[in-house]
């Protein structure tokens, strides 16, 4: 009698292990940046991985070494083929990833975006640092805090002409300049393509080309420190350097007075929120406009309609979660942040 009982117990044990393995496999989330090796994205990845540990899900942070559609598509396809249940991606292009993402959704993978969006029909929820109006307004307000002249020359400098988020912010910033500072001349808009060396060369080129430039507006984690370094190299500390980057990267420029203020949001929290939302989708299936989610140590976030981003597309299970706050960093508050 003992042998059959032992066999049954062994079978139950094997089945239990199989079920446990299946549950863990169903809780794998991929978190993809535009590229690896940039502090901003690394910090977002750290937040994502930390949230995964809190929730008991497996989070993999990986991205291409250069910001390309092909690199991100390859990663997306790899994660789908490995059986990941959710993918959260900062898109290098609003349309370029869509075929791969739509294929993934047809296979049951939950697709979210963070930092930089795709077209909304190519994902479910976008974890958004701020609306174009909010972030474009921040850029102009930070510039106006330093450029007091009615007649001024400003340059825009960021990652690329195709990246979704930054182009939306810049479009709003330019509209705000036209409406509120009609005497400001936008002399150029240039790009560093997420390359530190090219970004520094481009920033120095802007400063050399316009000796009477009043401000560089650089809403990009590579472009802003490059603009600050270029101003130091060329001894052009009369130029207001504003934009978006991480406090740890920008702290030396703030301490030396090259930069007076710059902005961002808590990208670590953005990574955490992304994983909490992805996990909620895996648990419940959908989040719809008006739904709320309580996230420990962050607060309550809600799903807003795509229209807040200027989109016309609305659908069930589709919307935007906006981070609760954005931050302007100065000498007075920068040491409160470490990312």
UniProtKB/Swiss-Prot annotation:
Keywords: Periplasm, Signal. It is found in: Periplasm. Residues 1-25 form the signal peptide. Part of the ABC transporter complex LsrABCD involved in autoinducer 2 (AI-2) import. Binds AI-2 and delivers it to the LsrC and LsrD permeases. NCBIfam families: PRK15408.1 (NF011937). The complex is composed of two ATP-binding proteins (LsrA), two transmembrane proteins (LsrC and LsrD) and a solute-binding protein (LsrB). The keyword Signal applies. GO terms for cellular component: ATP-binding cassette (ABC) transporter complex; outer membrane-bounded periplasmic space. It comes from Photorhabdus temperata. It comes from the Bacteria. One of its GO terms (molecular function) is carbohydrate binding. Gene3D superfamilies: 3.40.50.2300. Pfam families: Peripla_BP_4. Belongs to the bacterial solute-binding protein 2 family. This is Autoinducer 2-binding protein LsrB.
């Amino acid at each position: 009698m003992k042998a059959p009982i032992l066999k049954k117990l062994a079978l139950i044990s094997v089945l239990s292990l199989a079920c446990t393995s299946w549950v863990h496999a169903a809780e794998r989330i991929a978190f993809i940046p535009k590229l690896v090796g940039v502090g901003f994205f690394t910090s977002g990845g750290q937040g994502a991985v930390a949230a995964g540990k809190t929730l008991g899900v497996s989070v993999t942070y990986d991205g291409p070494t250069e910001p390309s559609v092909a690199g991100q598509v390859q990663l997306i396809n790899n994660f789908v083929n490995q059986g990941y249940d959710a993918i959260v991606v900062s898109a290098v292009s609003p349309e370029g990833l869509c075929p791969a993402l739509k294929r993934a959704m047809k296979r049951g993978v939950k697709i979210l975006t963070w930092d930089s969006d795709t077209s909304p029909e190519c994902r479910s929820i976008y974890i958004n640092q701020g609306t174009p109006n909010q972030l474009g307004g921040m850029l102009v307000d930070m510039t106006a805090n330093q450029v007091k002249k009615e007649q001024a020359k400003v340059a825009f400098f960021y990652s690329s002409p195709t990246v979704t988020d930054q182009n939306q912010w810049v479009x709003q910033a330019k509209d705000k300049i036209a409406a509120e500072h009609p005497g400001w001349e936008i002399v150029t808009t240039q790009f560093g393509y997420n390359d530190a060396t090219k970004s520094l060369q481009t920033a120095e080129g802007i400063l050399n080309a316009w000796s009477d430039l009043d401000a560089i507006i650089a809403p990009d984690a590579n472009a802003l420190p490059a603009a600050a370094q270029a101003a130091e190299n060329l001894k052009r500390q009369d130029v207001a350097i504003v934009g978006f980057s991480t406090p740890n990267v920008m702290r030396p420029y703030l301490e030396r007075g090259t930069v007076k203020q710059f902005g961002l949001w808590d990208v670590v929290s953005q990574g955490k929120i992304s994983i909490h939302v992805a996990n909620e989708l895996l648990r419940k299936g959908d989040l719809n406009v008006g739904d709320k989610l309580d996230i420990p140590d962050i607060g309550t976030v809600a799903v807003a309609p795509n229209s807040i981003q200027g989109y016309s597309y609305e659908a069930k299970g589709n919307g935007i979660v906006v981070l609760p706050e954005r931050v302007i960093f100065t000498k007075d508050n920068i040491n409160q942040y470490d990312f």
